């Protein structure tokens, strides 16, 4: 008799646990289904940013009308050959930029914050921010899904192993890596002219799936980034240029808005929110 009662008790407990598990699974299924349906209605957006978005934050573009960077030839401070000729000069050049970036006055502007809000709304599966900038203002504004195709100023790299390290101080020719059997001198984690940009496979994959491509603060004279708009159009994406003035590839864009980045980007993102929330709206309008 006792064995029978114990058996019934175990059976009730088993059924209760099974019922709770079924209920949990059902709730989880409907939650995921709802989330998927919501995400399916969101556009896939790729954003490209250039120096123009950070100019209002006090970041110098460095390139003057005569082609010099802070009175240095580009060939001397932004090429592998220049680094091999005079590594001390190159380190000094980027040390100055690194110090400037970390000044308290250098902060994100409304354009950076607007893009962070857009990413938060769309979710990482529907949003990729590709930047040509080597500053960290997108991160400071709250953006997460960022691809720095030209590297990052606050990082250094071992040229032998390819490992990347955080670095906020000055870098000298006597700073070596600790990741190799025979340590190599660390170099700025910057993509110089003549080197392959970072993450190109991921970028082209995102462009092939994009519904909307937005270029912000770009000049249109540096490839391969200048060709992204063409790639996006080939797969049917709507293309938008938000710039202080027309870029060299402005004819490739279907929609254009010109003015300070802090104004035109914020205004366009708010417009985009309205379009997304209107089921009858057309993103191309």
From Swiss-Prot:
The protein's enzyme class: transferase
Catalytic activities: N(6)-acetyl-L-lysyl-[protein] + NAD(+) + H2O = 2''-O-acetyl-ADP-D-ribose + nicotinamide + L-lysyl-[protein]; N(6)-succinyl-L-lysyl-[protein] + NAD(+) + H2O = 2''-O-succinyl-ADP-D-ribose + nicotinamide + L-lysyl-[protein]; N(6)-(2-hydroxyisobutanoyl)-L-lysyl-[protein] + NAD(+) + H2O = 2''-O-(2-hydroxyisobutanoyl)-ADP-D-ribose + nicotinamide + L-lysyl-[protein]
Obligatory cofactor(s): Zn(2+)
The keyword Chloroplast appears for this protein: no
CDD domains assigned: SIRT5_Af1_CobB
Chief localization: cytoplasm
GO molecular function: histone deacetylase activity, NAD-dependent; NAD+ binding; NAD-dependent protein de-2-hydroxyisobutyrylase activity; NAD-dependent protein lysine deacetylase activity; protein-malonyllysine demalonylase activity; protein-succinyllysine desuccinylase activity; zinc ion binding
EC number(s) given by UniProt: 2.3.1.286
Cellular compartment(s): Cytoplasm
Chain residues that bind NAD(+): 50-69, 132-135, 217-219, 243-245, 261
Cofactor note: Binds 1 zinc ion per subunit.
Active site: 150
Domain Deacetylase sirtuin-type: 10-285
Positions annotated to bind substrate: 94, 97
Keyword annotations of the record: Cytoplasm, Metal-binding, NAD, Transferase, Zinc
Positions contributing to Zn(2+) binding: 158, 177
Family the UniProt entry places it in: Belongs to the sirtuin family. Class III subfamily.
Functional summary from the UniProt entry: NAD-dependent lysine deacetylase that specifically removes acetyl groups on target proteins. Also acts as a protein-lysine deacylase by mediating protein desuccinylation and de-2-hydroxyisobutyrylation. Modulates the activities of several proteins which are inactive in their acylated form. Catalyzes deacetylation and de-2-hydroxyisobutyrylation of Eno at 'Lys-326' and 'Lys-343', respectively, thereby promoting the enolase activity.
HAMAP family reported in the protein's UniProt record: Sirtuin_ClassIII
Protein name listed in UniProt: NAD-dependent protein deacylase
Organism this protein belongs to: Proteus mirabilis (strain HI4320)
């Amino acid at each position: 008799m006792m064995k029978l009662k114990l058996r019934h008790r175990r059976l009730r407990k088993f059924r209760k646990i099974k019922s709770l598990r079924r209920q949990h699974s059902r709730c989880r299924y409907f939650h995921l289904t709802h989330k998927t349906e919501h995400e399916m209605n969101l556009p896939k957006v790729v954003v490209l940013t250039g120096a123009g978005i950070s100019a209002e934050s006090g970041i110098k573009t460095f390139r003057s009308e005569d082609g010099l960077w802070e009175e240095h030839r580009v060939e001397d401070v932004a090429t592998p050959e220049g680094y091999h000729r005079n590594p001390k000069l190159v380190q000094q050049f980027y040390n100055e930029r690194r110090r400037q970036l970390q000044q308290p006055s250098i902060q994100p502007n409304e354009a950076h914050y607007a893009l962070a809000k857009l990413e938060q709304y769309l979710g990482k599966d529907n949003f990729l921010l590709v930047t040509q900038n080597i500053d960290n203002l997108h991160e400071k504004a709250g953006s997460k899904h960022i691809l720095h195709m030209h590297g990052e100023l606050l990082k250094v790299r071992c040229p032998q192993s390819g490992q990347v390290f955080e670095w906020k101080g000055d870098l000298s020719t006597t700073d070596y890596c600790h990741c190799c059997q025979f340590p190599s001198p660390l170099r700025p984690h910057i993509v110089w002219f003549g080197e392959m940009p970072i993450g190109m496979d991921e970028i082209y994959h995102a462009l092939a799936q994009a519904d909307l491509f937005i270029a912000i603060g770009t000049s249109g004279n540096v490839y391969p980034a200048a060709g992204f708009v063409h790639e996006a159009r080939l797969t049917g994406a709507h293309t938008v240029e938000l710039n202080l003035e027309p870029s060299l590839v402005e004819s490739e864009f279907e929609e254009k808005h010109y003015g300070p980045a802090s104004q035109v980007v914020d205004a366009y993102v708010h417009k985009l929110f309205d379009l997304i929330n209107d089921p009858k709206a057309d993103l191309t309008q």
